A protein has these predicted regions:
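Phosphate/ribose-recognition catalytic cores of enzymes acting on nucleotide-derived substrates
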Residues: 3, 46-172
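Acidic/polar loop patches that form or flank catalytic/metal-binding clefts of enzymes
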Residues: 31, 41, 87
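Residue-level detector of secondary-structure transition/capping positions
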Residues: 37-38, 150
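Short amphipathic
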Residues: 39-47
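Long, positively charged amphipathic alpha-helical accessory segments at protein N-termini or as interdomain linkers
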Residues: 9, 14-15, 37, 81-82, ...
Length: 172
């Protein structure tokens, strides 16, 4: 049976419905429809290093056209680096605080992670949308929001713990 032939809550499960929910950032529905957490894979590239100067060094992850990204916003994610999963908050956006007309980037801030991983292929597992993209009037306002996002990300993981058995399985 193909994906388009299945149903969830009396509605057809098809790629159009999944893409629509991805565009909306509705990862709960996407993950329910798929039966697993949505993932994308990309290579960590050098960026502008602005996150590091703000106290939030990010992995700038390339995004291939084969993957449909969730809508613009900030998300609770897990990022797999060298076979190990890390809790993260990930932004998909144009960094509008720093100018207009910028390209869409995927930037993951891995919690409790200090390694340089340029050139590494990573997998991003998308769990929950925290908020949309905001244009801040000041860098101080952005940093304040990033601190709140980090707290919200940690709170999400505390409220949705992964069991030891599941953690061992996903780290295989």
């Amino acid at each position: 049976m193909g994906v388009g032939e299945k149903e969830l809550q009396s509605k057809k499960i098809g790629s159009s419905r999944i893409r629509h929910n991805l565009d909306q950032g509705d990862l709960k529905t996407v993950n329910d429809l798929l039966g697993y957490r949505y993932q994308t894979t990309g290579t960590v590239m050098h960026g502008e290093a602005r996150g590091r100067t703000l106290g939030f060094p990010t992995a700038n992850v390339s995004h291939d056209a084969q993957y449909w990204l969730p809508g613009i916003g900030v998300y609770v994610t897990r990022v797999k680096v060298n076979g190990k999963w890390y809790q993260a908050m990930t932004s998909i956006g144009r960094n509008v605080t720093f100018g207009e007309g910028r390209p869409v980037t995927v930037e993951a801030y891995l919690l409790d992670f200090k390694q340089a991983i340029y050139g590494e292929i990573v997998t991003v597992e998308w769990d929950y949308r925290l908020r949309g993209e905001i244009k801040f009037d000041s860098v101080a306002g952005l940093i304040q929001q990033l601190n709140q996002d980090a707290q919200d990300t940690k709170a999400y993981f505390e409220a949705h713990p992964i069991t030891k058995l599941a953690l061992e399985w996903i780290n295989c």
